[in-house]
Amino acid sequence: MEKQHNRGQEGAGLSAVKLSSEPGNEYMFRERAEGKNAVTEIFADVHKHYKGLSQEQLSDVSFAKTSLPFAGELYMGHLRYSTTGKSGLSYVHPFLRRNNWKAKNLCMCGNFNMTNIEDIFEKLTDQGQCPRIYSDTYLLLEFMGHRLDREVERNFVKAQELGLTKRDITEYIEDNIQISNVLKTTMEHFDGGYVICGQTGSGEMFSIRDPWAIRPAFYYKNDEIVVVASERPVLQTTFDLECEDIQELKPGQALIVNKRGEASLQQIIEPKTYSACSFERIYFSRGSDRDIYKEREKLGQQLTERVLEAVNYDTTHTVLSFIPNTAEVAFYGLTHGFKEWIDKRKVEQIVALGSNPSEEDIHQILKQGIRAEKVAWKDIKLRTFITEGNSRNDLASHVYDITYESIEPYKDNLVIIDDSIVRGTTLKESILHILDRLHPKKIVIVSSAPQIRFPDYYGIDMPRPEEFCVFRATIELIRERNMENLLHEVYEACKKEVAKPKGEHLNNSVKAIYKPFTIEEINQKIVEILRPQGMTTPVELVFQSIEGLHNAIPNHPGDWYFTGDYPTPGGMRLVNQNFINYYEHEHLKHNMS
């Protein structure tokens, strides 16, 4: 869990299951906490149960099995990375559904956003249930719990048919539960990106990946352990493994372990169009993964020529740096690209000196090199990418500080590479303001990702399109050029899409708002929107191209953030519906004012 801290600092939880507890004793344990120190807190709380026990007791396996809380055979841990900006312990995984029958207890956690919650809510209420909470996690828990109840009841009837009674029925149920039945009858109804893990009170454990492979999952198993994690290097470090030892869970596949410890891979849902998320590779995932490191490096290197154009090929007076730390590997790629270009120019200059160059001339040429500095520092550990909206701007103004005199004022260009630019909050409220204090000749902000034009409904829930600086800039261009009829046309087209019957192919009608404008036009408008008041330094934006994205990350084609090509019907429905909401509430309100 410590090695996956990059996947969430808002909370953490763990659960454990004992396989051989007697009635009257707890067999399913859970601990949760909020805050960036949550991992430390939950383990400290677990260890409190062991105070006062002798080393002999702690080393006694039989004593541990019968008497020690959290000493079990099944474990599950989760780090919270908000997908909605909501906070509170009730949102921290794992979630637990209790029952007096061991086999009906279900503990669940996961990385997911479901895009058809209305449909699921309707299915549950049609069954006669009355859900207390309207959220994808809670509804998934209840839906899966209902199917688990049905699987237990199926085995109960079978046991009675075999003439079994009382405890023999319970043993039969626990020995014959088919978690694959539960997963098949549950997950066929859900639309979205997910990796869901669960454990039952009777000792079954599972992990399932969505059929589009949107969210990542890796596993390792041998004769002693079965382990699943969101990232490969976490397993490598924790269990001292090579890349080749670890497998990736396939689309729609589940890794299931029964109470006897027998692990099997089962195809629960037929694979759909392969759409593994590219933004996982750019931002979310740990950069120490072998392949992710190479991909991020290439993303940066591919931007070399466009950055050189932005600084008029003046490498002598250009300083390279990066913000935030997740952009560091892309920064290395950019510096490698600069080095290759400078080295090539050195060769050309030396050849041009002729057959008898002077030592001084050669020395001057060889002095040319990359100028890279640590210009910005993250002053405190604050994340503004996903924060409750009313506090985001205030946080952003305090996130970064600068290294003073790291560039030559009014002479040096300053190039800052970021992994991606989403809202532009930190740029506007902090970064551009503090970089301007260095008085560079020009600031070039480089994004290793393409322009983010559409929300992600599969992992990071940013439901309002007006949150994106690219969208806001495009709307401003539309208004400036008196093209607001285009917005109305898109609005009407979106309404037609969401009115289509379920199962009919949907299109993303919102794409049309971007078509009249070039990337450069949108970039210039973004600069106008994000430029702090009083800033005088010229600013230019450079984004990765879609082609560059796929060239650097060829095995993860999911690019809906940038293209609007959502792989699931639920994603398509939401992008159209959210534009309808924007048009009816924000755009019309703007016109009235």
Please describe what each predicted stretch is.
Residues 1-250, 256-319, 323-324:
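Conserved short alpha-helical segments that host acidic/polar catalytic motifs at enzyme active sites
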Residues 24-29, 119, 207-210, 217-218, ...:
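A short acidic (Asp/Glu
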Residues 157-177, 338-357, 361-375, 381-382:
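Amphipathic alpha-helical
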Residues 189-192, 295-316, 329, 334-337, ...:
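Phosphate/ATP-binding catalytic cores across multiple sugar-kinase/actin-like superfamilies
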Residues 255, 303, 320, 334, ...:
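Conserved hydrophobic/aromatic pocket- or pore-lining residues that grip, position, or stack substrates
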Residues 261-277, 322-359:
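Terminal amphipathic helices with adjacent charged low-complexity linkers/tails
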Residues 320, 327-334, 338, 372, ...:
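Extended, hydrophobic alpha-helical segments in both membrane/secreted and soluble proteins
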